[in-house]
Regions:
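Amphipathic alpha-helical
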Residues: 91-123, 220-235, 244, 250, ...
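Residue patterns forming the tRNA-binding/recognition surfaces of aminoacyl-tRNA synthetases
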Residues: 2, 18-158, 177-178, 183-189, ...
């Protein structure tokens, strides 16, 4: 046989530990933000060590044999030094960048989350149809008509900047003579509803829209769609989405002026489909990946109106006055707050008052992302973060995505379906967001030039000597030395004016920690492997988007190859409801 020593290991950084320490603070009515980072980190380290000790003794009592006197912990000084060294390989190669783009964001934890830190749950949300008045168009019939958008995130309407259409989608201008006008007439809106109002909508979705708005009056039994609304006249206009180029609408809250008085252009989006909704998609570059890319390509930038805790900025125009009255309090709730988005909430109330709310119901069932730790809903939020690019050309050829996809084909997966699972995830994933706005973790050890833009040459300091000083200090003192007084001057050394540089205090995604284990366990330990490659990685199927995934990306980025030859995936023992058993769910 062959010697296969078991090296016990623990991931020690991250949100689960912080969450427990913060719970202790809350019981004592302490504010975490008032505690110095070094003190908070010391408490997190002590908490993690306590449970490392408890679990070690429990596993030994079970008769599990391993190198208990020499485990690996991601919070050990040498581990933290290696993790930083691996990060600096990305930085020095030009494969680390700072950018602003929508990322998964937890308003409860006030940090960005990776896909592996998100769980999807079935929920019921508010769905609304909103009318945007068309003010300009090369098609005369559209001027004065209303474009209809559908959304399940009413809270994003105050930061709408455009409307997307599908170039190949068939659209119609429907004469709304009875149903919705009748609906609006009982809402106290300010817009006159007498006479016919024309609504622009994708033809394949008109029936669905009419069902959603409970408009059965305008239909003729057995008649074609062209007779909806007005039994005498056909649609006022019918055409392809590509005909809508140059069309402009105005925001339903345009009366507020400022941001809301700006025109809302119609933009072509290849992501617009007729699967659901209205075939017209409201665009907010702050809160959606497609929105961000399409708007930025057309000169529309994020406005950063939603803060880290999920509330609109106090100076945002939609909030208006009345900080202390009920009107003001209602608008200062977190956007994930259910009443905030309800048909009776502030968004819908304002749209109803403007005569723009065509339907509102809180009965839409769908799958929605939640934080794996707090179990609270997450949002897409545009924030400055640090990323590893998936599609940038790497030295030696290929991209991180193409390298990983190639290595996935070489690795043996047991069962075989694991290859397809991880492959589909890598193939479609966005750039890897590495930064977290938390305290307990390996710091993202970067310095950036004051006053420079992320796109400027020299924005990020890529000096191997500076990086070596950081790694040497971490090896003997641990990552806490990054937070010590005078750390910036110490690490920059005599070659740089510390006043010209800013020190980054974000921490690394914990999946980068665990993804680096091949370096500080397999490569660096005396009992590791000669080539730094594991014969087998074995974990549950959830790790196709976790440890297997991050390890593959990390190793392909620094070594150009997979860190393992075989991946074995096991199943889970489930509870009586079919849920995975875990301490956080309380079902173990």
């Amino acid at each position: 046989g062959k010697d296969a020593p078991y090296v016990p290991g623990r991931d020690c950084h991250g949100l689960p530990i912080e969450w427990k320490v913060e719970e202790q603070y809350r019981k004592k009515k302490l504010d975490k933000k008032a505690v110095p980072p070094s003190e908070f980190r010391a408490e997190c380290r002590a908490y993690a060590q306590k449970w490392v000790d408890v679990q070690r003794e429990q596993l030994k009592r079970l008769g599990i044999m391993g190198d208990w006197g020499n485990p690996y912990l991601t919070m050990q000084f040498d581990s933290e030094a290696t993790i930083v060294a691996e990060l600096m390989k990305f930085a020095e190669a030009g494969n680390l960048y700072r950018g602003s783009k929508p990322v998964m964001w937890s308003p409860v934890e006030e940090t960005a989350l990776a896909e592996a830190e998100v769980e999807y749950e079935d929920i019921t949300s508010t769905q609304i149809d909103v009318a945007f008045e068309i003010t300009e168009s090369p098609i005369a019939e559209l001027v004065g008509a209303h474009a209809v958008i559908w959304t399940t995130t009413p809270w994003t309407i105050p930061v709408n900047q455009a409307i997307a259409y599908g170039p190949d989608v068939e659209y119609v201008l429907w004469a709304d003579a009875l149903g919705i006008a009748r609906f609006l007439s009982g809402t106290g809106n300010k817009m006159p509803v007498a006479g016919t109002r024309y609504l622009l909508i994708a033809e394949p979705l008109l029936l669905e829209f009419l069902d959603r708005t409970n408009d059965g009056i305008g239909r003729l039994p057995g008649a074609g769609l062209e007779h909806f609304g007005d039994p005498v006249q056909p649609f006022k206009w019918r055409g392809k989405g590509s005909d809508l180029a140059g069309t402009v609408a105005r925001h339903p809250m345009h009366h507020l002026g400022g941001f809301y008085a700006k025109p809302r252009p119609f933009l072509p989006g290849d992501f617009v489909t007729t699967d659901s909704g209205t075939g017209l998609v409201h665009m907010s570059p702050d809160h959606g990946e497609d929105d961000f890319l399409l708007c930025r390509a057309n000169g529309l930038e994020p406005v950063f109106a939603v803060m880290a805790d999920g509330r609109y900025r106090d100076d945002w125009e939609w909030l208006g006055a009345g900080d202390l009255d009920e009107y003001g309090k209602e608008r200062r709730r977190s956007v994930i707050n259910k009443p905030f988005n309800s048909p009776e909430g502030p968004i819908c109330s304002d749209l109803r008052e403007a005569g723009a709310l065509l339907s509102a119901s809180d009965d839409y069932q769908h799958s929605y992302p939640h934080s794996w730790r707090s179990k609270a809903k997450v949002i897409y939020r545009c924030t400055p973060q640090w990323f590893v690019p998936m599609d940038k050309e790497l030295g030696g050829g290929g991209t991180l995505r193409s390298r990983a996809m190639s290595e996935i084909e070489r690795v043996r997966f047991i069962p075989e379906k694991g290859r397809r699972r991880i492959g589909s995830m890598v193939e479609g994933r966005p750039d890897w967001v590495l930064s977290r706005q938390r305290a307990w973790g390996v710091p993202l050890t970067c310095f950036v030039k004051k006053g420079a833009l992320p796109t400027d040459e020299g924005f990020l300091l890529r000096d191997p000597e500076v990086n070596a000083r950081i790694c040497e200090a971490f090896e003997t003192e641990g990552a806490d030395c990054w937070y010590a007084e005078g750390a910036k001057e110490r690490f920059l050394g005599d070659g740089y004016d510390a006043a010209e540089w800013e020190q980054v205090f974000d921490v690394l995604d914990v999946w980068f920690d665990s993804g680096s284990t091949h370096a500080f366990v397999l490569r660096d330990r005396a009992d590791g492997t000669e080539d730094g490659i594991a014969d087998v990685y074995m974990e549950g199927t959830d790790q196709h988007r976790g440890w297997f995934h991050s390890s593959m990306l990390q190793a392909c980025g620094t070594m150009g190859r997979a860190p393992y030859r075989n991946v074995v995936t096991h199943g889970f023992t489930l509870d009586e409801k079919g849920n995975k058993m875990s301490k956080s769910l309380g079902n173990t």
